[in-house]
Amino acid sequence: MSPSPEQVMQFLYALRSRGVRDRAVLTAMEKIDRGLFVEGVFSGRAYEDVPLPIACGQTISQPSIVGLMTQAAEIGPRHHVLEVGTGAGYQAAILSQLARRVWTVDRHRRLTRAAEARFKALDLTNVTVLTGDGSFGLPDQAPFDRILVTAAAEDPPGPLLAQLREGGIMVVPVGQSDAVQSLIKVTRTESGFDYEEMRSVRFVPLVEGIAPENSA
Protein backbone atom coordinates (compact mmCIF):
# COMPACT_ATOMS: atom_id res chain seq x y z
CA MET A 1 0.00 0.00 0.00
CA SER A 2 1.34 3.42 -0.97
CA PRO A 3 2.10 5.88 1.83
CA SER A 4 -0.33 8.69 2.56
CA PRO A 5 0.67 12.29 1.78
CA GLU A 6 0.98 12.86 5.54
CA GLN A 7 3.39 9.93 5.87
CA VAL A 8 5.50 11.26 3.01
CA MET A 9 5.63 14.73 4.55
CA GLN A 10 6.66 13.32 7.93
CA PHE A 11 9.22 11.09 6.23
CA LEU A 12 10.84 13.99 4.37
CA TYR A 13 10.76 16.18 7.48
CA ALA A 14 12.57 13.46 9.44
CA LEU A 15 15.21 13.19 6.73
CA ARG A 16 15.82 16.94 6.70
CA SER A 17 15.97 17.12 10.48
CA ARG A 18 18.71 14.47 10.46
CA GLY A 19 20.85 16.31 7.93
CA VAL A 20 19.64 15.13 4.53
CA ARG A 21 19.30 18.45 2.71
CA ASP A 22 20.31 17.72 -0.89
CA ARG A 23 17.25 18.35 -3.07
CA ALA A 24 18.04 15.62 -5.61
CA VAL A 25 18.51 13.04 -2.86
CA LEU A 26 15.25 14.04 -1.16
CA THR A 27 13.41 13.86 -4.49
CA ALA A 28 14.78 10.36 -5.13
CA MET A 29 13.76 9.21 -1.66
CA GLU A 30 10.30 10.67 -2.11
CA LYS A 31 9.90 8.84 -5.43
CA ILE A 32 11.09 5.39 -4.29
CA ASP A 33 8.56 3.76 -1.97
CA ARG A 34 10.50 2.12 0.87
CA GLY A 35 7.42 0.01 1.57
CA LEU A 36 8.19 -2.04 -1.55
CA PHE A 37 11.45 -3.18 0.06
CA VAL A 38 10.07 -4.18 3.48
CA GLU A 39 8.13 -7.41 3.93
CA GLY A 40 5.90 -9.14 6.43
CA VAL A 41 5.17 -7.79 9.88
CA PHE A 42 7.55 -4.86 9.38
CA SER A 43 5.83 -3.46 6.28
CA GLY A 44 3.79 -1.06 8.41
CA ARG A 45 7.01 0.53 9.70
CA ALA A 46 8.52 1.24 6.29
CA TYR A 47 8.33 5.02 6.74
CA GLU A 48 9.83 5.09 10.22
CA ASP A 49 13.45 6.19 10.43
CA VAL A 50 14.69 2.86 11.76
CA PRO A 51 16.61 -0.11 10.33
CA LEU A 52 14.42 -3.18 9.82
CA PRO A 53 15.19 -6.90 9.50
CA ILE A 54 15.13 -8.56 6.09
CA ALA A 55 15.96 -12.09 4.94
CA CYS A 56 19.31 -13.81 5.46
CA GLY A 57 19.93 -12.10 8.81
CA GLN A 58 20.48 -8.74 7.12
CA THR A 59 18.82 -5.34 7.58
CA ILE A 60 17.48 -2.51 5.47
CA SER A 61 19.23 0.63 6.68
CA GLN A 62 17.31 3.45 8.29
CA PRO A 63 16.30 6.03 5.68
CA SER A 64 18.31 8.89 7.16
CA ILE A 65 21.51 6.84 6.88
CA VAL A 66 20.65 5.95 3.29
CA GLY A 67 20.12 9.64 2.61
CA LEU A 68 23.30 10.77 4.35
CA MET A 69 25.44 8.18 2.54
CA THR A 70 23.91 9.11 -0.80
CA GLN A 71 24.35 12.81 -0.10
CA ALA A 72 27.99 12.32 0.91
CA ALA A 73 28.69 10.46 -2.32
CA GLU A 74 27.79 13.56 -4.37
CA ILE A 75 26.39 11.49 -7.23
CA GLY A 76 26.00 13.09 -10.64
CA PRO A 77 23.98 12.02 -13.69
CA ARG A 78 27.02 10.69 -15.57
CA HIS A 79 28.41 8.62 -12.74
CA HIS A 80 28.94 4.89 -12.69
CA VAL A 81 28.27 3.65 -9.16
CA LEU A 82 29.07 0.40 -7.35
CA GLU A 83 27.09 -0.63 -4.29
CA VAL A 84 28.49 -3.41 -2.12
CA GLY A 85 25.69 -5.07 -0.15
CA THR A 86 22.43 -5.07 -2.10
CA GLY A 87 20.26 -6.16 0.80
CA ALA A 88 16.64 -5.42 -0.03
CA GLY A 89 17.69 -3.15 -2.91
CA TYR A 90 16.46 0.12 -1.43
CA GLN A 91 19.79 1.95 -1.53
CA ALA A 92 20.43 0.86 -5.13
CA ALA A 93 16.97 2.05 -6.14
CA ILE A 94 17.75 5.49 -4.70
CA LEU A 95 21.09 5.52 -6.52
CA SER A 96 19.35 4.65 -9.79
CA GLN A 97 17.53 7.99 -9.67
CA LEU A 98 20.80 9.93 -9.54
CA ALA A 99 23.44 8.00 -11.51
CA ARG A 100 23.84 6.83 -15.09
CA ARG A 101 24.59 3.21 -14.15
CA VAL A 102 24.47 1.28 -10.88
CA TRP A 103 26.01 -2.10 -10.19
CA THR A 104 25.02 -3.73 -6.91
CA VAL A 105 26.45 -6.97 -5.55
CA ASP A 106 25.51 -9.16 -2.59
CA ARG A 107 26.75 -12.52 -1.32
CA HIS A 108 23.19 -13.79 -0.73
CA ARG A 109 21.55 -15.10 -3.90
CA ARG A 110 18.13 -14.98 -2.22
CA LEU A 111 18.52 -11.23 -1.70
CA THR A 112 19.80 -10.47 -5.19
CA ARG A 113 16.94 -12.39 -6.79
CA ALA A 114 14.36 -10.51 -4.71
CA ALA A 115 16.03 -7.15 -5.40
CA GLU A 116 16.19 -7.85 -9.12
CA ALA A 117 12.44 -8.58 -9.14
CA ARG A 118 11.78 -5.27 -7.36
CA PHE A 119 13.92 -3.33 -9.81
CA LYS A 120 12.10 -4.95 -12.72
CA ALA A 121 8.71 -4.06 -11.21
CA LEU A 122 9.88 -0.45 -10.82
CA ASP A 123 11.35 -0.41 -14.35
CA LEU A 124 14.80 0.56 -13.07
CA THR A 125 16.70 -0.32 -16.22
CA ASN A 126 20.03 1.23 -15.19
CA VAL A 127 20.65 -1.17 -12.27
CA THR A 128 22.60 -4.41 -12.66
CA VAL A 129 22.36 -6.94 -9.80
CA LEU A 130 25.04 -9.55 -9.22
CA THR A 131 25.60 -12.32 -6.70
CA GLY A 132 29.19 -12.41 -5.53
CA ASP A 133 31.81 -11.38 -3.00
CA GLY A 134 31.45 -7.62 -2.96
CA SER A 135 34.58 -7.10 -0.87
CA PHE A 136 36.57 -7.63 -4.07
CA GLY A 137 34.41 -5.24 -6.08
CA LEU A 138 33.79 -5.73 -9.79
CA PRO A 139 37.16 -5.39 -11.56
CA ASP A 140 35.64 -5.95 -15.01
CA GLN A 141 33.42 -2.88 -14.61
CA ALA A 142 35.98 -0.64 -12.90
CA PRO A 143 36.88 2.12 -12.46
CA PHE A 144 33.86 3.54 -10.64
CA ASP A 145 33.05 7.17 -10.00
CA ARG A 146 31.37 6.33 -6.71
CA ILE A 147 31.33 3.30 -4.39
CA LEU A 148 28.92 2.82 -1.47
CA VAL A 149 29.48 0.00 0.99
CA THR A 150 26.50 -0.97 3.14
CA ALA A 151 28.31 -3.32 5.51
CA ALA A 152 31.10 -2.58 7.96
CA ALA A 153 34.72 -3.41 7.17
CA GLU A 154 37.61 -3.22 9.62
CA ASP A 155 39.37 -0.98 7.08
CA PRO A 156 38.30 0.38 3.69
CA PRO A 157 38.79 -2.68 1.44
CA GLY A 158 41.90 -2.40 -0.72
CA PRO A 159 40.30 -3.88 -3.86
CA LEU A 160 37.53 -1.29 -3.68
CA LEU A 161 39.98 1.57 -3.23
CA ALA A 162 41.86 0.32 -6.29
CA GLN A 163 38.65 0.39 -8.35
CA LEU A 164 37.84 4.00 -7.47
CA ARG A 165 38.49 6.51 -10.25
CA GLU A 166 40.72 9.50 -9.49
CA GLY A 167 38.42 12.15 -8.04
CA GLY A 168 35.99 9.40 -7.05
CA ILE A 169 34.31 9.00 -3.68
CA MET A 170 33.69 5.92 -1.56
CA VAL A 171 31.41 5.96 1.48
CA VAL A 172 32.01 3.04 3.83
CA PRO A 173 31.32 2.15 7.49
CA VAL A 174 34.56 1.15 9.22
CA GLY A 175 35.03 -0.68 12.51
CA GLN A 176 34.37 -3.88 14.41
CA SER A 177 30.98 -5.53 13.86
CA ASP A 178 30.29 -5.72 17.61
CA ALA A 179 31.02 -2.05 18.29
CA VAL A 180 30.04 1.40 17.13
CA GLN A 181 31.57 2.09 13.73
CA SER A 182 32.54 5.25 11.86
CA LEU A 183 31.08 6.26 8.52
CA ILE A 184 34.04 7.29 6.38
CA LYS A 185 34.10 9.31 3.15
CA VAL A 186 37.14 8.42 1.06
CA THR A 187 38.15 10.63 -1.88
CA ARG A 188 40.77 9.43 -4.35
CA THR A 189 43.23 12.18 -5.22
CA GLU A 190 46.14 12.39 -7.62
CA SER A 191 48.52 11.52 -4.79
CA GLY A 192 46.47 9.02 -2.77
CA PHE A 193 43.34 9.04 -0.63
CA ASP A 194 41.73 11.58 1.68
CA TYR A 195 39.64 10.26 4.58
CA GLU A 196 36.83 12.16 6.29
CA GLU A 197 35.04 10.75 9.34
CA MET A 198 31.36 11.62 9.11
CA ARG A 199 29.48 10.08 12.04
CA SER A 200 28.97 7.00 14.22
CA VAL A 201 26.90 4.16 12.73
CA ARG A 202 26.02 0.49 13.24
CA PHE A 203 26.08 -1.87 10.24
CA VAL A 204 26.17 -5.62 9.75
CA PRO A 205 29.71 -6.87 9.00
CA LEU A 206 31.15 -7.15 5.51
CA VAL A 207 31.68 -10.89 5.03
CA GLU A 208 33.83 -12.45 2.33
CA GLY A 209 32.64 -15.29 0.12
CA ILE A 210 29.26 -16.25 -1.33
CA ALA A 211 26.63 -17.40 1.16
CA PRO A 212 25.31 -20.98 0.92
CA GLU A 213 22.19 -21.31 -1.22
CA ASN A 214 20.10 -22.39 1.77
CA SER A 215 21.15 -19.56 4.10
CA ALA A 216 18.20 -18.12 6.03
UniProtKB/Swiss-Prot annotation:
SUPFAM superfamilies: S-adenosyl-L-methionine-dependent methyltransferases (SSF53335). GO terms for biological process: methylation; protein modification process; protein repair. Coiled coil: none annotated. It is found in: Cytoplasm. InterPro entries: PCMT, SAM-dependent_MTases_sf. Keywords: Cytoplasm, Methyltransferase, S-adenosyl-L-methionine, Transferase. This is Protein-L-isoaspartate O-methyltransferase. The active site is at 61. Pfam families: PCMT. It comes from Dinoroseobacter shibae (strain DSM 16493 / NCIMB 14021 / DFL 12). It comes from the Bacteria. It catalyses: [protein]-L-isoaspartate + S-adenosyl-L-methionine = [protein]-L-isoaspartate alpha-methyl ester + S-adenosyl-L-homocysteine. The lineage of its organism: Bacteria, Pseudomonadati, Pseudomonadota, Alphaproteobacteria, Rhodobacterales. One of its GO terms (cellular component) is cytoplasm. It is an enzyme of class 2 (transferase). Its main location: cytoplasm.
